[in-house]
């Protein structure tokens, strides 16, 4: 509203407020106001609200500090009526208009309806690079978990642990996409645009279908003997058979097996889990399969190189998402890092096993898995540079789409695939179902809480 119009409005209301003192012009001015904004020379609460809006009682920067005013809050017309002892049904006449006029003037002059501007400063360059580098380093340590967890693969409880982490990855990736990355790509703010409830409904639609589908399958499935189930062509995913470990050419009378699973067969187990079985007199001899040499690169299956390259691209995009998120706010960078970390734990373990089955030694698998993970640092640098110099919305959109694909098209079928050989009856099936629910709901709740309380959490 133009300043002249605001001043005119203040003078008009001031003159109207003097109606009780100067009956002549004051009463005339009051009647002018009431005739324009009211009906039958009286004002209702709704008409007073319209008057306040027309006169410029809108938001403005520069709110007085608390304690300077008796009423330092934004007052609605109903609240003004209540403060002066009027009910909402009261009709303000000329005689009563002067009573509420000071309140109207106060609201017009100090503009308490304006929320205090929150200075949303971006993190400093040192904070962005420091927290980003720390997050990527912690995530990359997941690529080394294969060596630690390989001995646990044959434990009876390991499938349950892995199922929980896969469910956790699905929940965090999916929630991070719909709560933060995709809304941020469109420029939405959870405190202003109120999209969180709708995002919860999106997750709710996905979860309800998952819940009822699994319940129906458990109720209708016929559990046969020896752990096999029969439900038509009910397969949770494509049938995959574990290939036998590849035996590499004999070197100096020794045969090297890349897959550590064969260490049970009367061979010697080295630190790198490579079994060396003597084919002559059982005497252990030095093997060229130790250290990082292992089998020749030409003898390693093509699938190993495909996994390594695709994983490097995947980690590069992960780094982009972390870098761009950290430039926006450290909390959003933390949320994105948590989602990626939960996904990397089972993902890197699966890649590690695939590399072993493709013919790599354990140390070779660790080396190439770690090298592909290091591409996350390159992505982090690009993400920070783009986020500091350009709007990172495109990166958020790209990462959001990638997170949706990984969670729904990649890890969700993998989570169901894991049950095919492990389910031996309805009780076991229900146990895995509850573990899946626990993982997904834990990831969903964590990202939801971070989104809801992002304004109250400060990372110093």
From Swiss-Prot:
Induction of expression: Up-regulated by manganese. Up-regulated by lipopolysaccharides (at protein level). Up-regulated by inflammatory cytokines like TNF. Down-regulated following phorbol ester treatment. Up-regulated by zinc and T-cell activation. (Microbial infection) Up-regulated by live and heat-killed Mycobacterium bovis bacterial cell wall.
Effect noted on mutating residue 38 to R: In CDG2N; loss of manganese ion transmembrane transport; loss of localization to the plasma membrane; retained in the endoplasmic reticulum; no effect on protein abundance
Glycosylation (residues): 40, 88
Catalytic activity: Zn(2+)(out) + 2 hydrogencarbonate(out) = Zn(2+)(in) + 2 hydrogencarbonate(in); selenite(out) + Zn(2+)(out) + hydrogencarbonate(out) = selenite(in) + Zn(2+)(in) + hydrogencarbonate(in); Mn(2+)(out) + 2 hydrogencarbonate(out) = Mn(2+)(in) + 2 hydrogencarbonate(in); Fe(2+)(out) + 2 hydrogencarbonate(out) = Fe(2+)(in) + 2 hydrogencarbonate(in)
Subcellular location field: Cell membrane; Lysosome membrane; Apical cell membrane; Basolateral cell membrane
Position of the signal peptide: 1-22
Assigned GO CC terms: apical plasma membrane; basolateral plasma membrane; lysosomal membrane; organelle membrane; plasma membrane
Tissue specificity annotation: Ubiquitously expressed. Expressed in thymus, placenta, lung, liver, pancreas, salivary gland and, to a lower extent, in spleen, testis, ovary, small intestine, colon, leukocyte, heart. Highest expression is observed in pancreas. Expressed by macrophages (at protein level). Expressed by microvascular capillary endothelial cells that constitute the blood-brain barrier (at protein level).
Main location: membrane
Source organism superkingdom: Eukaryota
Motif XEXPHE-motif, residue numbers: 343-348
PTM notes: N-glycosylated. N-glycosylation is not required for proper iron and zinc transport.
Keyword Membrane: yes
GO biological process: one example: bicarbonate transport
Membrane topology according to the record: Multi-pass membrane protein
Disease: Congenital disorder of glycosylation 2N: A form of congenital disorder of glycosylation, a genetically heterogeneous group of autosomal recessive, multisystem disorders caused by a defect in glycoprotein biosynthesis and characterized by under-glycosylated serum glycoproteins. Congenital disorders of glycosylation result in a wide variety of clinical features, such as defects in the nervous system development, psychomotor retardation, dysmorphic features, hypotonia, coagulation disorders, and immunodeficiency.
Subunit structure of this chain's protein: Homodimer.
Family under the similarity heading: Belongs to the ZIP transporter (TC 2.A.5) family.
Protein name: Metal cation symporter ZIP8
Source taxonomy: Eukaryota, Metazoa, Chordata, Craniata, Vertebrata
